[in-house]
Design a protein with these regions (language model features):
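Membrane-proximal helix-turn-helix segments that form the acceptor-binding/catalytic region
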Residues: 11, 41-79
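Conserved donor-binding/catalytic core segment of Leloir-type glycosyltransferases
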Residues: 81, 122-139, 145-148
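Conserved small/polar residues in nucleotide/adenosyl-binding loops
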Residues: 299-301
């Protein structure tokens, strides 16, 4: 991103509203991801040198200058918009006195009745869990890899709707079903047809919102996630899933899944909370109206 646009807007007295969807203005790595601690120690810029060297093959810690330049420009905008409070907190921990407003993303429900007549579903006595989306290292690939081995010979099946960076996960094996790419509007049907009971959103970076969580909830399926970022924030707020401590082990995750499987009453309560949440779920139109109101408040016409 070129910062000149802030300067030009200021020179011409053009009010700026800046919407942030990632952490690029804090670090060009974008996600503040550390494979050991999940969220990196972004507040300590002195420790950024080793990460910069590894990520960008540069032997200079440019993060203090990067943030100085961004801060000077961000101070000139009228308002900054982010999609979650966890994201807002990370930015305010970095840039103390910015004006930041939270506007959550909207999401439209899928029209049409799901197909509940899959004969394979009726025969299925397994507890089906799923990963959805493109699963990379920071999206929890290692947990997908480990769980597919852990569930072999059990009454738990793991499904992947989407793809991974590990080609070995892009094929079926015992207790593991690879579905591959999907069309977004088809996902609720696919999840229902395959009797998915739980979705694993085991992202290892502090996601700023998570559309995959929205897709899970629209499908009326509870989730498990780590206590990190917007996913945990949203799950806790509506009580629509279960939260794991950061750096939980495979055994911890498998134990939680087994506990959920054995607690149908608690599971039913989570589903009911999801249904209650969906009654007032923000649509894309609602989100657009929020943005329109914010922009019109700064436009004097």
């Amino acid at each position: 991103m070129y910062l000149d646009i802030f300067k030009v807007a200021k020179e011409r007295s053009i009010p700026v509203i800046y919407t942030l969807h990632d952490f690029y203005s804090i670090c060009p790595s974008v996600k503040l991801f550390n494979k050991e601690t999940f969220l990196c120690n972004y507040a300590n810029t002195a420790g950024c040198g080793s990460c910069i060297a590894k990520t960008f093959n540069l032997n200079i810690n440019f993060i203090p200058l990067w943030r100085k330049e961004f801060y000077e420009n961000l101070k000139t905008v009228k308002k900054i918009i982010v999609p979650s409070y966890s994201t807002k907190n990370i930015f305010l921990n970095t840039y103390k006195d910015l004006t930041i407003e939270v506007v959550e993303h909207g999401y439209d429900k899928i029209n049409g009745k799901p197909n509940n007549d899959n004969p394979d579903k009726k025969k299925n006595k397994k507890f089906n869990i799923a990963f959805i989306g493109y699963i990379t290292e920071e999206k929890g690939l290692k947990y997908l890899e480990e769980l597919t081995e852990k569930v072999k010979g059990t009454d738990i099946n793991v499904h992947l709707f989407g793809q991974t960076t590990n080609k070995k996960c892009n094929k079926n094996k015992k207790n593991y079903v690879y579905h591959g790419k999907y069309i977004q509007q088809d996902l609720p049907n696919l999840l229902l047809e395959n009797d998915i009971k739980l979705i694993c959103l085991l992202s290892m970076w502090p996601e700023t919102y998570s559309y995959t969580l929205s897709e899970s909830l629209i499908s009326e399926i509870p989730v498990i996630s780590f206590d990190l970022g917007a996913i945990a924030e949203r799950v806790k707020k509506a009580d629509v899933g279960w939260i794991l401590p950061i750096n939980s082990t495979l055994d911890d995750i498998f134990k939680l899944i087994s506990t959920i499987k054995s607690a149908p009453q608690e599971y039913k309560q989570k589903v009911e909370r999801i249904r209650h949440l969906l009654k007032n779920m923000k649509s894309l139109k609602d989100m657009g109206n929020e943005y329109t109101e914010i922009y019109l408040s700064l436009i004097h016409i």
